[in-house]
Amino acid sequence: MNPTDSYVILYKGEEPVDSALLDADNRFFMELDSLEEGLYNFYHRPEFQYVYLEKGDSLQIRLNTVSFDESLVFSGRGETLNNFLIDLYLETESEEGLIRHSFVPLEPQAFSAKLDSLKSNKISRLESLHNDFTLSENGYELALASILYKNFYYKEKYPFWHRQVIGEGVLHDLPADFYDYRSQVSYDNPNLTFLKPYYDFMLYHIGNLAFMGCQKSCDMDQAKIRNQLHFNQHQLQLIDSLVTGQDLRDNLFRTVAFEYLLKNDTEENFEIFMEDFHARSGENRHLEEINHLSESIRNLRPNVELPALLVENTEGENLSLKDIASRGKVVFYFWSGPEPRHLVNITRRVHDLSEKHPDTRFVGICLRTSRDRWKTLLGNHGLKEEDQFWTGDFQSFAHTLVVYHPFKSILTKDGRIIDGFANLNTSF
């Protein structure tokens, strides 16, 4: 019900397997001649959710996009495991508030006892389901992993959350057996690579190992360990030494690279990191994407000319960013129609900054919005037409200008970049 797009895409990992258009009744049909058992996900923009498929399954999926996850129900052959997984997902989502507010302030032993009680309850329900319906070996393993790795994830988070909640200056001492669960961790199970609880755990686990290991052996205090280059090189080394599953390696390397690169470290550190990354993950399947990001960052360094991108004014004329910024100080910022609250906030912020910096022109670029909708929003929000521009090429702008933060801005003077990673809230 209430479709938000005209089609549904089925993925195995990151590869599309099949797609189907919705018919006049908002229904779709897929038939797979050959099927690899395992975890898939179906995507109906902008939402996605898991589905576990085995040979011979015949599933009907019902949902209302207004409450995508909450309304999702599976029926038919294969329904038992999939309904358990979606119920588990919803239950886990709702538990985080309880864990953070009620469990995290507790001492380590009490925290573990509370958390393990939740885990035991879920495993008990899974065992009952398995006894009644005899789940496949791989299906059972995946459901169990969904429970275990979410539990492990919270235990990895606990020392840092606890320090924050209690207001302690250093991490709390932990019992010797607190991390015993790590002996159960698999670094090379291909069936779990794209399972969110597993990946979320693995990413935080690597970061935790990097932090704790450096705290013991690098002769640095906790604040300095978070040095961008130092900490992230530790993460690269750990992924390289621990993780053997290729897809998992590639994805973890990619995530660490993106998180580091988008923090805009010094030019020297940036090049050191990239050299280390290429030495450890030179065949990464995401390499083109990572190299493109790194090149875009290089092109936004101080004193570099603005990239050759065109935008459209309200008269339908195309202008280059360089021409718009050719005289004096200009700050480019970004907004989009589908994010109305952000538009209100950023408009208010730009108004304040314009009064504070009358010698600077603040120029808005609208992304991910139709041309007609853009023009309507200009009037609705009282935006000056001469300082507002539009582009229909979101991908080029997002990638070339590295627009990954809602208050990302670019400060220029006479057509050259002063700060390619300015923040409207903190840089002015």
What are these regions (language model features)?
Residues E317-V350, R361-V363:
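Short active-site neighborhood of thiol/selenol oxidoreductases, capturing the structured segment around
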Residues L378-S409, K413:
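Short, internal strand/loop/helix patches
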Residues A145, Y149-Q215:
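Extended amphipathic alpha-helical segments with heptad-repeat/coiled-coil character used for oligomerization
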Residues D188-L262, I272:
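Long, charge-rich alpha-helical interaction segments
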Residues M1-G139:
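A non-transmembrane, solvent-exposed segment enriched in polar/low-complexity residues
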Residues H286-K322:
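N-terminal "domain-start" segment that seeds a small globular fold
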Residues Y404-F428:
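Non-catalytic, surface beta->alpha helical segment in thiol-disulfide oxidoreductase systems
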Residues R341-N380, Q395-F397:
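Structural microenvironment flanking redox-active thiols in thiol-disulfide oxidoreductases
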